[in-house]
């Protein structure tokens, strides 16, 4: 084992599998500036882009194949990519000798977790969603510890002895949102602000929805579209492909209503912001994780839930206007979503990891 303190993070595919890791690294840097950080992910991916924007995190790519629950001829070629990913991860980990490998989810994390198991490196896998994905289910077979973002997730890991409910880490920018930023973005509007957020990869259904509802001039609309649409500003409408962390924190905190997908990371940010949300979970081609996330909130009256298949049959503008005019409903939704807040999650996890490093180095 190396004398240097090193932690390897691995995960990706969406921002929801990357931002929590960045949050943990931010907190670890505050608590112990001697730790070196590495991130293993896929080449030319969202995780590579996001990690390379950070300071002092070395990104290393490995081959990886998608893990599927259904038959596909790609399963055969992807199987060999997974094997290659395990082999490269093995040699990378053997070279750098980290004390911990931390998986944040996504199929890219599995080769590294398996390789770290072969090398007897301490392994932690963190399930961000309520319902574990296939990657986490596989990772859990090799992990020493499982961290969960929802208390309700523990039932999916009954056979594992070391499960810790940590919550989902939130980036430090979201803990102190700046009200001046939302004023700059909306040009000091006095109108109610409704923000449509498509996530790190964008969302066609939400993009189409935003283009429809922006015609209503009595509301100021903020639209985060992903790379499929160009940036645009109109009288009551601002569209950007991406907002930075400070901008997004201000948008989530000071918008009157947020319309969003139902990824676990986004939900935890909304809970931290204590905001009123309309959730339209991703359905087609997904494993249903966002639907379960959204229904958990719906059942606790913490969000307005709209099924993706019902978008065309739902008068979204009517829902928005009725909600804006119902102060009691807004207050109730805000109070209930606040129960899902884990603003101290990054600190908790960082302290656990520092203890793990001390324990490993003392052996």
From Swiss-Prot:
<keyword id="KW-0573">Peptidoglycan synthesis</keyword>
<dbReference type="Pfam" id="PF03033">
    <property type="entry name" value="Glyco_transf_28"/>
</dbReference>
<dbReference type="GO" id="GO:0008360">
    <property type="term" value="P:regulation of cell shape"/>
</dbReference>
<keyword id="KW-0997">Cell inner membrane</keyword>
<dbReference type="InterPro" id="IPR006009">
    <property type="entry name" value="GlcNAc_MurG"/>
</dbReference>
<keyword id="KW-0808">Transferase</keyword>
<feature type="binding site">
    <location>
        <begin position="14"/>
        <end position="16"/>
    </location>
    <ligand>
        <name>UDP-N-acetyl-alpha-D-glucosamine</name>
    </ligand>
</feature>
<comment type="function">
    <text>Cell wall formation. Catalyzes the transfer of a GlcNAc subunit on undecaprenyl-pyrophosphoryl-MurNAc-pentapeptide (lipid intermediate I) to form undecaprenyl-pyrophosphoryl-MurNAc-(pentapeptide)GlcNAc (lipid intermediate II).</text>
</comment>
<keyword id="KW-0328">Glycosyltransferase</keyword>
<keyword id="KW-1003">Cell membrane</keyword>
<dbReference type="GO" id="GO:0051301">
    <property type="term" value="P:cell division"/>
</dbReference>
<dbReference type="GO" id="GO:0009252">
    <property type="term" value="P:peptidoglycan biosynthetic process"/>
</dbReference>
<dbReference type="GO" id="GO:0030259">
    <property type="term" value="P:lipid glycosylation"/>
</dbReference>
<dbReference type="Pfam" id="PF04101">
    <property type="entry name" value="Glyco_tran_28_C"/>
</dbReference>
<keyword id="KW-0472">Membrane</keyword>
<dbReference type="InterPro" id="IPR004276">
    <property type="entry name" value="GlycoTrans_28_N"/>
</dbReference>
<keyword id="KW-0133">Cell shape</keyword>
<dbReference type="InterPro" id="IPR007235">
    <property type="entry name" value="Glyco_trans_28_C"/>
</dbReference>
<dbReference type="GO" id="GO:0071555">
    <property type="term" value="P:cell wall organization"/>
</dbReference>
<dbReference type="GO" id="GO:0050511">
    <property type="term" value="F:undecaprenyldiphospho-muramoylpentapeptide beta-N-acetylglucosaminyltransferase activity"/>
</dbReference>
<dbReference type="GO" id="GO:0051991">
    <property type="term" value="F:UDP-N-acetyl-D-glucosamine:N-acetylmuramoyl-L-alanyl-D-glutamyl-meso-2,6-diaminopimelyl-D-alanyl-D-alanine-diphosphoundecaprenol 4-beta-N-acetylglucosaminlytransferase activity"/>
</dbReference>
<feature type="binding site">
    <location>
        <position position="171"/>
    </location>
    <ligand>
        <name>UDP-N-acetyl-alpha-D-glucosamine</name>
    </ligand>
</feature>
<dbReference type="GO" id="GO:0005886">
    <property type="term" value="C:plasma membrane"/>
</dbReference>
<comment type="pathway">
    <text>Cell wall biogenesis; peptidoglycan biosynthesis.</text>
</comment>
<keyword id="KW-0131">Cell cycle</keyword>
<keyword id="KW-0961">Cell wall biogenesis/degradation</keyword>
<comment type="similarity">
    <text>Belongs to the glycosyltransferase 28 family. MurG subfamily.</text>
</comment>
<keyword id="KW-0132">Cell division</keyword>
<feature type="binding site">
    <location>
        <position position="200"/>
    </location>
    <ligand>
        <name>UDP-N-acetyl-alpha-D-glucosamine</name>
    </ligand>
</feature>
<feature type="binding site">
    <location>
        <position position="290"/>
    </location>
    <ligand>
        <name>UDP-N-acetyl-alpha-D-glucosamine</name>
    </ligand>
</feature>
<dbReference type="GO" id="GO:0005975">
    <property type="term" value="P:carbohydrate metabolic process"/>
</dbReference>
<protein>
    <recommendedName>
        <fullName>UDP-N-acetylglucosamine--N-acetylmuramyl-(pentapeptide) pyrophosphoryl-undecaprenol N-acetylglucosamine transferase</fullName>
        <ecNumber>2.4.1.227</ecNumber>
    </recommendedName>
</protein>
